[in-house]
Amino acid sequence: MTTLENPEMQAQLLSAALPYMQRYENKHVVVKYGGHAMGNPELGKAFARDVALLKQSGVNPIVVHGGGPQIQAMLTKLGIESRFEGGLRVTDEKTVEVVEMVLAGSINKEIVALINAEGEWAIGLCGKDGNMVFAQKAHKTVIDPDSNIEKVLDLGFVGEPAEVDRTLLDLLARSEMIPVIAPVAPGRDGHTYNINADTFAGAIAGALAATRLLFLTDVPGVLDKDKKLIKELSVADAQALIRDGTISGGMIPKVETCIDAIRRGVEGVVILNGKTPHSVLLELFTEHGAGTLIVP
């Protein structure tokens, strides 16, 4: 008999989790769902069950999802070539139509169906619904390696959140529904914009003054120079680790997004491994958590 099949052990686990469930009761927890976990059916079911359990425990979960690999697969299938500027994808009019179709029309509904299969009421949304999010054109700059001059990149319809209205999300929370949100939003200029899912999740969490924002990634969290997991960091600690090179590469923008979310009013942001089954529950409902917590 395994630990989880032992009734006494099950009771002990539930008892140990109770104080943490009470801590998050009626609190907003935003979960950014992405990475390889999205492509694994078993991990997808485990994630949906975790989200359902959060709702049943009195938490108000909000899911924001990405879908980069699925977008690229559809662009390839349709014969639409991707153009890059400074290593970043340019989103033209044809591409943004595909992005919206894949994110809001396909992936979003798959996640909704998984959560609903666990007995909860999930509803699929994007930034356009209820004027929840308005975007503005993102401005990116790079240093030209030849001239060492800063160059402004035109990435087309790549945006960033400019305005977030929490009215619809509050209404859904009172209605016992779980919002699942695709990072697509309109601009005041009438165009549709594709927004980085991490940035979008941070803006949603900030508008809600969420207790936690969880980033499900393909790594355990922030690692020290000995490649050991750092359990907790202040914003100042995180900035120091970026300066000394401990935090490097693709982890830098992830941590900077965490810092930005905290400045927007989020109480704590966690980077954790979405490939670990039930990592959301391990983070919220156990003593030691499951990733790196960044706090003010």
From Swiss-Prot:
Sequence positions that bind substrate: 67-68, 89, 194
One annotated GO molecular function: ATP binding
InterPro entries, sorted: AceGlu_kinase-like_sf, AcgluKinase_fam, ArgB, Asp/Glu/Uridylate_kinase, NAGK-C
UniProt keyword annotations, A-Z: Amino-acid biosynthesis, Arginine biosynthesis, ATP-binding, Cytoplasm, Kinase, Nucleotide-binding, Transferase
Main enzyme class: transferase
EC number, as in UniProt: 2.7.2.8
Transition state stabilizer (site feature) positions: 32, 254
Subcellular location, record wording: Cytoplasm
Catalytic activity: N-acetyl-L-glutamate + ATP = N-acetyl-L-glutamyl 5-phosphate + ADP
One GO CC term on file: cytoplasm
Pfam families: AA_kinase (PF00696)
Functional pathway: Amino-acid biosynthesis; L-arginine biosynthesis; N(2)-acetyl-L-ornithine from L-glutamate: step 2/4
Gene Ontology biological process terms, A to Z: arginine biosynthetic process via ornithine; L-arginine biosynthetic process
Function, in words: Catalyzes the ATP-dependent phosphorylation of N-acetyl-L-glutamate.
Family: Belongs to the acetylglutamate kinase family. ArgB subfamily.
HAMAP family per UniProt: ArgB
Name by which UniProt lists this protein: Acetylglutamate kinase
Organism the protein comes from: Brucella canis (strain ATCC 23365 / NCTC 10854 / RM-666)
